[in-house]
């Protein structure tokens, strides 16, 4: 694997394509790209300029505990079975590698780490789901802002949202809560969908998934929550007897639930149905079990999303040459790029 200094990587100030040859790497600038480690704040993204005229933008999110500075170099260096890299396959794409803010992680004794949101152990994804709310709201809002800016620059049909692991989970939440125009595609590696158990149950006509408390112990008696079952069973303001909810179709109810849960308002748009999704997942993933990826795909299917998932035999919690090759083919099709 090549060293970081060999990759086309810069911080906020990028080298323009005219300053180098078509296939020459941008010099790596550690000083320019070093993430600011102020807790709770998003560091400046690392931006990789396109090799040719800027026509597309890829917004890329790393996994929990990583940063853009760590995540970008290996992704830029890996080659597909046909010998392509991300930059040679998409020479017109600006690559924006985002870095999550540093926040306290509950399962790591509240130590500070870069994470898009806090969560409980992956072995029990339906437990302590209230931990995810604040981070998902903040991170999805941050991603929405980047999407808006890049769509304004190159057009919605030329913007891609991409994430690994927790970055994939955040990308999917950002997609489901997006109320702008449909962008080109979302791609995820080794990912999962937060609140998947509750979303699936709502779409299937249930009320609260498998019985686990989505809101946390301190909110079990919250009468203001339309999804809470703790009130009077004859009170039409509780559960799915609420008129505002029962007038909606089930997928819209699920998206409304998601938006309510992370406090993003109740304007439940369904734009995500017009944004194709590709998910790649290794069958031997030791951190995000493939069952969680399958659950995410099932939920997206039930919500009416255009989703495809490819499983990679023997692959652990990472991506492979084959996965990247499949993703490149998918993106070429959605971006209407011929090889």
Q: Where do the protein language model's features map onto the residues?
A:
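N-terminal cap/lid segment of alpha/beta-hydrolase-fold proteins
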Residues: 2-51, 56, 133-139, 223-253
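Serine-hydrolase catalytic machinery in alpha/beta-hydrolase-like enzymes
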Residues: 31-158
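Short hydrophobic segments within beta-strands
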Residues: 59-61, 98, 162, 189, ...
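Gly/Ala-rich beta-loop-alpha elbow adjacent to hydrolase catalytic centers
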Residues: 162-167, 171
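Active-site signature of alpha/beta-hydrolase-fold catalytic machinery across serine-
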Residues: 173-177
